């Protein structure tokens, strides 16, 4: 049984059984028909994934692994906020007529900042510190720039990553202010597990723990029947992540640099409505 499945099932059961509904409150998200998209939530979920044991991917529903990696590279490698650089349509609802999602996600990672050692963007600063100052407790990124929030078409959900080197092991804490459990949980866990593998590989480190901290873990009202169906399934064993050993530079990775070997998963036959 995949450990990612165990975590997801446990989280969803906890939310459905003991969560709090926001139906009495005004909410921002809307369904395609204009109706308010309400949620049931739990506050402060913390999940730990040891990447030395297995790669965390759900099998109780088939995950679009390649698309998830493509979006990860769009943000962290291309540092783009234009959907023209993305090979999927997951951001179309938040893009303007030019294809931009504003000063969000990749834009923030690409802004150069002045440090004592010189000018770096946030990704290059992480790479620098992992190589030259791995004992630092200051290796982190943040996408939640209050100065630019008014120019973001969607505020960052997964907004901060703190990296920590323990011996020769690279660990990371992913902070997420908001998590749509059905559409995004398995997706984000896969992505940041891949990201941890990438940083570890180019820094001569071993990928260790990914700790996922979710402030508001929620299930939308119209997602409840789909979630109940998915978590009733019998999980398959976790697949193995293959990563191209020839990719020795962070910026040389492509979607073809990764694949899941031995991945068996249940098909997702129901269309998932997305609240915007």
What kind of feature is each model-predicted range?
Residues 1-276:
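Terminal, non-catalytic protein-protein interaction segments that mediate quaternary/complex assembly
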């Amino acid at each position: 049984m995949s450990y990612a499945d165990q975590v997801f099932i446990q989280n969803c059961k906890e939310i459905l059984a003991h969560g709090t509904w926001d139906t009495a409150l005004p909410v921002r998200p809307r369904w395609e028909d204009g109706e308010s998209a309400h949620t049931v939530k739990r506050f402060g979920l913390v999940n730990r994934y040891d990447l030395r044991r297995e790669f965390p991917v759900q099998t109780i529903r088939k995950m679009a692994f390649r698309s998830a990696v493509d979006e990860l590279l769009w943000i962290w490698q291309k540092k783009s906020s234009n959907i023209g650089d993305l090979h999927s349509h997951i951001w179309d609802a938040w893009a303007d007529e030019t294809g931009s999602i504003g000063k969000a996600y990749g834009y923030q990672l690409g802004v150069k900042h002045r440090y004592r050692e010189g000018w770096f963007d946030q990704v290059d600063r992480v790479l620098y510190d992992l190589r030259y100052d791995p004992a630092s407790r200051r290796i982190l990124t943040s996408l939640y720039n209050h100065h630019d929030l008014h120019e973001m078409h969607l505020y960052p959900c997964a907004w901060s990553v703190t990296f920590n080197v323990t011996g020769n092991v690279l660990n990371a804490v992913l902070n997420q202010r908001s998590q749509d459990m059905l559409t995004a949980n398995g997706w984000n866990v896969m992505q940041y597990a891949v990201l941890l593998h990438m940083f570890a590989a180019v820094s001569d480190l071993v990928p260790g723990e990914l700790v996922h901290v979710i402030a508001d873990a929620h299930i939308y009202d119209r997602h409840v029947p789909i979630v109940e169906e998915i978590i009733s399934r019998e999980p398959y064993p976790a697949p193995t992540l293959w990563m191209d050993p020839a990719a020795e530079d962070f910026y040389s990775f492509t979607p073809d640099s990764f694949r899941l070997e031995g991945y068996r998963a249940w098909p997702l036959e129901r269309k998932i409505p997305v609240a915007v």
